[in-house]
C-alpha cells in the first residue's frame, strides 16, 4: 500500500499511525 511500511496485512495500521 502507498503509506504502508510493513506488509499489506498491517497496511491499515501503518496508514493509521501516519495519519494520526
UniProtKB/Swiss-Prot annotation:
Single biological process term from Gene Ontology: defense response
Keywords from the named record: Pathogenesis-related protein, Plant defense
Induction, per UniProt: By heavy metal ions.
Family: Belongs to the BetVI family.
Stated name of the protein: Protein PR-L4
Organism: Lupinus luteus (European yellow lupine)
